[in-house]
């Protein structure tokens, strides 16, 4: 987190970047309504037997047409598809490059956000996921 805060200061982005913790539903909707880019990198904690799950926050952002920058860890590559609904990064240097590229290329940022929303609506909504699980359970029975 300190390295991210340092990059924010280095590029003088304090007025444009907010690192937020836990928020309620109304706060979340307000934040997403005023957000251009979801940045949620994850550390590899596999040695501690802690793996990032699917990443519901990426889908919540997608519902607001917000593309995401995510790490290639755990289930996040299933939530964010590289160069289609956002960008997948390997390390802090790629995070820096990904942020710059989506800030500088508004057209691509908007395209990724639109793709993310379409995917969230058509493939990742709760009704579709519940049906998939029900079908799987019926198949096993």
Where are these regions (language model features)?
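Conserved acidic donor-binding segment of nucleotide-sugar-dependent glycosyltransferases
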Residues: 82-93, 101-107
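Short hydrophobic beta-strand element within catalytic cores of glycosyltransferases
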Residues: 58, 62-63, 67-70, 80
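Short acidic active-site motifs
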Residues: 26-27, 94
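Nucleotide-activated donor-binding/catalytic signature segment of Leloir-type glycosyltransferases, i.e.
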Residues: 3-26
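A short, well-ordered alpha-helix in the C-terminal region of glycosyltransferases
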Residues: 101, 108-123, 129-135
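Acidic donor-binding loop of glycosyltransferase active sites
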Residues: 33-51, 66
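Short alpha-helical donor nucleotide-sugar binding micro-motif in glycosyltransferases
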Residues: 22-23, 30-35
């Amino acid at each position: 987190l300190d390295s991210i805060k340092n990059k924010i200061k280095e590029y003088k982005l304090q007025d444009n970047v907010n690192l937020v913790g836990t928020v309620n539903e109304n706060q979340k909707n307000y934040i997403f309504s005023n957000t251009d880019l979801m940045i949620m990198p994850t550390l590899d904690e596999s040695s501690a037997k802690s793996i990032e799950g699917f990443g519901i926050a990426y889908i919540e952002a997608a519902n607001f047409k917000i593309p995401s920058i995510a790490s290639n860890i755990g289930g996040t590559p299933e939530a964010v598809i590289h160069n289609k609904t956002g960008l997948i990064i390997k390390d802090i240097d790629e995070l820096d490059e990904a942020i710059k590229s989506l800030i500088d290329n508004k057209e691509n940022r908007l395209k990724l956000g639109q793709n993310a929303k379409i995917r969230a609506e058509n493939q990742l909504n709760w009704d579709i996921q519940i049906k998939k699980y029900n079908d799987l359970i019926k198949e096993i029975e």
